[in-house]
C-alpha cells in the first residue's frame, strides 16, 4: 500500500514536471518529452493516491456516499485518455532514449 506521504511526493513530482514543460513551451522550446513525462507522472500519482484512499477507507470506499469509488474510476481514465501510458512510454523510448519504434 502506498502511504499518503508517498502519494503526496508523487503528486509534487508531477506538478514540477508540469511546470517545467510549461516553461519550455512558453519559451518556444521543444517540450514533448517533458509534457509526456508530466502526463505519465500525474496519471500514476493520481492512481496511487486513489488506491491509497480506497485502501484506507476499506469497504466504505465503495459506498456511493463518500465519492471515493467515483474518484477511483475517474483516475483510471487518466491512464488511458487522451493518450495511454503505454504510448507515452513508447514515445519516450523512441524520442528520448533513441530506441527503435515499438508500435
Regions found by a protein language model. Give the residues of each.
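Alpha-helical interface subdomain recognition
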Residues: 3-103
Amino acid at each position: 500500500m502506498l502511504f499518503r506521504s508517498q502519494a503526496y511526493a508523487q503528486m509534487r513530482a508531477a506538478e514540477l514536471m508540469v511546470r517545467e514543460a510549461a516553461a519550455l513551451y512558453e519559451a518556444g522550446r521543444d517540450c514533448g518529452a517533458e509534457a509526456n513525462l508530466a502526463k505519465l507522472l500525474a496519471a500514476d500519482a493520481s492512481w496511487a493516491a486513489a488506491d491509497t484512499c480506497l485502501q484506507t477507507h476499506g469497504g466504505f470506499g465503495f459506498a456511493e456516499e463518500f465519492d471515493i469509488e467515483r474518484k477511483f474510476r475517474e483516475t483510471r481514465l487518466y491512464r488511458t485518455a487522451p493518450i495511454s501510458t503505454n504510448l507515452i512510454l513508447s514515445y519516450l523510448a523512441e524520442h528520448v532514449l533513441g530506441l527503435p519504434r515499438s508500435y
